[in-house]
């Protein structure tokens, strides 16, 4: 019943593009809006993203690349953060990776191969925008996988900052990934079949050992991790955090005890997304407003376009 109500509310939020002449895009802090968008407009770019004519400004010189997580896609993941960033003056780009083109279920393939896909996409963004580097914001696997690109594929020269929302930096468990699969249409089938990225994200995998050998970070980029203590996918939740210089680790409940968001809903959590804005523009950072945020659905904001 709760999901049905949320979907009904989300119908009015989902717009594939902004109306002609609109100054801002709506920002639906509701995970149901993402599922609805992916159902009605599968494979579509998140609102405001992938404008290849966008040019970065002096205030925001780095385009932002959004990287979704396991079993997800760019459409269901970024219906809130993409328009929020565009409304705040950023050039925003998003991709699907790690799955068959047109498949709703993405990010199940070999993670180093996905990192190479990210690298090719970053090169395209840099060439189109004329920027020297990008900022990367990722969720779950999408917050961890760019670290492979940064460490092994030259991303230390092209990434200015990596912001991870509940990233699987040090792995997860079988039960954690199974619960994540249930959150996305088609996820359980993919989890029950061939999901190389799932195996690579299990705690103690050879992939994670290689990724984290010699330290969590490399010189050059800055790193921000935003996590919720109610994460039941990345467990313990503190395993999302990184150690090293130029690292900021944020636990949402340290800012707001009323934030009850979980692993899935964090990408539609107004408090978490405000923290993303702060990470990308620390000089203009402001404290997020503390308000009730629900598990799974997210929330905590209004449809204000900011």
Language-model features: where?
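Extracellular/periplasmic catalytic domains that process cell-envelope and extracellular macromolecules
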Residues: 56-60, 85-87, 128-129, 137-138, ...
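Conserved alpha/beta-hydrolase
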Residues: 84-102
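Serine-dependent carboxylesterase/thioesterase catalytic core
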Residues: 67-68, 92, 112-212
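Flexible, membrane-associating and regulatory peripheral segments of lipid-active enzymes
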Residues: 1-88, 291-306
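C-terminal catalytic-base region of ester-bond hydrolases, centering on the histidine
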Residues: 218-306
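Extracytoplasmic/secreted proteins, especially bacterial periplasmic and envelope-associated proteins
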Residues: 62, 66, 76, 80, ...
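Alpha/beta-hydrolase active-site loop signature
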Residues: 71, 99-101, 169
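Second-shell loop/turn segments in exported
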Residues: 69-72, 103-109, 196-198, 260-266
């Amino acid at each position: 019943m709760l999901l049905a109500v949320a979907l009904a509310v989300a119908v009015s939020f989902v717009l594939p593009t902004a109306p002609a002449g609109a100054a801002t895009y709506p920002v639906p802090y509701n995970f149901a809006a993402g599922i609805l968008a992916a159902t009605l407009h599968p494979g579509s770019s998140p609102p405001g993203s992938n404008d290849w004519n966008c040019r970065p400004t002096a205030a925001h010189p780095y385009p932002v690349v959004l990287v979704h997580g396991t079993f997800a896609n760019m459409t269901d993941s970024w219906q809130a953060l993409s328009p929020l960033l565009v409304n705040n003056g950023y050039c925003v780009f998003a991709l699907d990776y790690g799955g068959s083109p047109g498949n709703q279920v993405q990010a199940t393939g070999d993670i180093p191969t996905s990192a190479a896909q990210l690298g090719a996409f970053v090169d395209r963004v840099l060439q189109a925008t004329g920027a020297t580097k990008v900022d990367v914001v990722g969720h779950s696997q999408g917050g961890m996988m760019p670290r492979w690109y940064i460490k092994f594929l030259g991303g230390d020269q092209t990434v200015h900052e990596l912001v991870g929302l509940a990233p699987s930096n040090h792995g997860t468990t079988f039960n954690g990934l199974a619960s994540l699969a249930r959150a996305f249409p088609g996820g359980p089938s993919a989890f029950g079949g061939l999901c190389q990225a799932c195996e690579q994200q299990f705690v103690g995998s050879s992939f994670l050992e290689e990724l984290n050998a010699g330290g969590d970070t490399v010189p050059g980029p800055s790193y921000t991790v935003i996590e919720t203590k109610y994460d039941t996918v990345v467990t313990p939740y503190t395993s999302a955090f990184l150690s090293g210089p130029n690292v900021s680790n944020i636990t949402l409940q340290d800012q707001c005890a009323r934030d009850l968001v979980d692993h899935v809903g964090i990408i539609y959590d107004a408090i978490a997304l405000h923290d993303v804005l702060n990470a990308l523009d620390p000089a203009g950072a402001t404290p997020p407003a503390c308000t009730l945020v629900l598990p799974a659905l997210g929330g905590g904001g209004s449809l204000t376009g900011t």
